[in-house]
Amino acid sequence: MKQIELKILDPRIGKEFPLPEHATAGSAGMDLRACIDQALIIKPGETQLIPTGIAIHISDPGLAATILPRSGLGHKHGIVLGNLVGLIDSDYQGPLMVSCWNRSTESFRLEPGERLAQLVFLPVVQATFEIVDEFKSSERGEGGFGHSGKH
C-alpha cells in the first residue's frame, strides 16, 4: 500500500467526519465528504464548489489522483461533478474541492459530512512525443467515432 501525505484542513475530519479510507479490501476509491457548516441546497442546474476539509501531496510523479462521482448520487439524485472528473497532479498541495452539479429537475440538500465523491489514485506515464511523417500500419488505422461498431 502506498502512503500519501494528507493535511487536515477542517478539524471535524477524523472526529465528526471519518478520514478518507478504502471501505473494503476491494474498494478502488475513498469517500470524500462535504465539509460545510450547514446544509446546502443545490438547485436544479446549479453548480457548487464544496470543500472536503483535506489537502493531499502525492509527491510521486508516477501517480495522480482523480475525484470521481459517487454512482448513487448521480443515478438517484442527478448530482454529478461539474468538471466530470477532477485530476489531482502529484505536485498539487492545495485543498481538495468538489464541483457538484445538479443536473436533475429537483433541488438537492447536501448535509455536512455527507459523502459526495470518491478519490482514486492512478499510475501516470509521463510521455514525450517523437515526430514522425507516417505511422506504422495498425488494424484500426484512422477509424474513430463509431468506426468499430454500431455506436
Swiss-Prot record:
Magnesium recorded as keyword: yes
An example Gene Ontology biological process: dUTP catabolic process
Pathway: Pyrimidine metabolism; dUMP biosynthesis; dUMP from dCTP (dUTP route): step 2/2
Catalysis performed (reactions): dUTP + H2O = dUMP + diphosphate + H(+)
UniProt: substrate binding residues: 70-72, 83, 87-89, 97
Record keyword Membrane present: no
GO molecular function (one): dUTP diphosphatase activity
Top enzyme category: hydrolase
EC number: 3.6.1.23
Cofactor(s) the record lists: Mg(2+)
Xref: Pfam families: dUTPase
Keywords of the record: Hydrolase, Magnesium, Metal-binding, Nucleotide metabolism
Functional description taken from the UniProt entry: This enzyme is involved in nucleotide metabolism: it produces dUMP, the immediate precursor of thymidine nucleotides and it decreases the intracellular concentration of dUTP so that uracil cannot be incorporated into DNA.
Family listed: Belongs to the dUTPase family.
Database matches in NCBIfam families: dut, PRK00601.1
The protein, known as: Deoxyuridine 5'-triphosphate nucleotidohydrolase
The species this protein was found in: Psychromonas ingrahamii (strain DSM 17664 / CCUG 51855 / 37)
